[in-house]
């Protein structure tokens, strides 16, 4: 029960922090393969409209604005809405793409600055491939796990992404059903902007096929030191391939299919020496206190 309350407290704190910030950045996916199109979303939570000035050149990827911006619902902001801008990022090599801080000029005269962003680019070999049998046709699909920290501390949050690479036959997904060993996890959900407003999924052209990319995000919490694992299944709605193109123009049959999620392994570490004995979970079950003799303080005075 304490662990559940701690996790809920962490989620509440993150939500309040997002609502308080005037500039929020979030990725459609921050782990991709070369050629995969992803998006960096910039959200002005006060509803200001910013100019789309030329973007910087970065090593290993191309950047471009992909929309004039639009409004989305954002609780806690004026009129309950925020201004959303999107940058399409397409990497061309394996490694890490570093995007510097961006300065945005708004129509109200304000200047907004984003934090530097990092995009991880995996080799194609990191995708684990499998096949579905749809109406006698073998339909391939792939999955890729991204975990921020491969060696987290016990009970500490470790953000992750599960990415699905599928052809056009796969139409939509339910939330993945995850099976874990010595590991707790949040429910896997689509990315923030997909939840707030339906946004295009990622895509990548690989071996002559245009793969649609769906990303689910979550957080892992190792429960003990050593190797911990996660795997599972995800249910998808798929269109059955029709042998006769003429019939396919008028009739489309659909079916629910179960897609296997490959196992991911991480190695959890014991808490470091000197950690408080009650440092037990993601939020921290410990006490922070301070004292001061001063009665009158100036801004930013220690």
Residue locations for each model-derived region?
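Surface-exposed interaction/ligand-binding surfaces
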Residues: 20-302
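Sec-dependent N-terminal signal peptides
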Residues: 4-15
């Amino acid at each position: 029960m304490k662990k559940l309350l701690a996790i809920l407290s962490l989620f509440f704190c993150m939500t309040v922090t997002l609502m308080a910030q005037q500039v929020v950045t979030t990725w459609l996916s921050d782990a991709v393969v070369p050629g995969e199109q992803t998006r960096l979303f910039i959200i002005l939570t006060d509803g200001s409209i910013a100019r789309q000035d030329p973007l910087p050149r970065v090593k290993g990827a191309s950047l471009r604005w992909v929309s004039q911006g639009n409004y989305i619902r954002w609780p806690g902001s004026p009129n309950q809405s925020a201004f959303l801008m999107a940058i399409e990022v397409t990497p061309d090599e394996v490694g890490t793409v570093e995007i510097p801080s961006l300065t945005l000029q708004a129509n109200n005269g304000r200047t907004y600055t984003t934090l530097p962003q990092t995009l991880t680019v995996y080799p194609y070999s990191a995708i684990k491939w499998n096949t579905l049998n749809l109406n006698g046709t073998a339909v391939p699909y792939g999955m890729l796990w991204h975990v921020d920290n491969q060696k987290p501390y016990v009970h500490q949050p470790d953000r992750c992404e599960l990415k699905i690479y599928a052809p056009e036959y796969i139409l939509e997904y339910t939330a993945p059903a995850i099976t874990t060993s010595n590991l707790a996890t949040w429910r896997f959900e689509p990315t923030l902007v997909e939840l707030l407003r339906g946004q295009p999924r990622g895509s990548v052209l690989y071996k002559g096929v245009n793969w649609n990319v769906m990303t689910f995000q979550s957080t892992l919490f190792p429960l003990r030191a050593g190797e911990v694992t996660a795997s599972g299944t995800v249910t998808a709605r798929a269109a059955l391939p029709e042998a006769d193109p003429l019939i396919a123009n008028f009739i489309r049959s659909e079916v629910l299919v179960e897609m296997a999620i490959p196992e991911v392994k991480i190695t959890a570490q014991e808490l470091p020496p000197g950690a408080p004995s009650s440092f037990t979970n993601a939020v921290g079950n410990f006490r922070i206190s301070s004292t001061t003799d001063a009665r009158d303080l100036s801004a930013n005075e220690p």
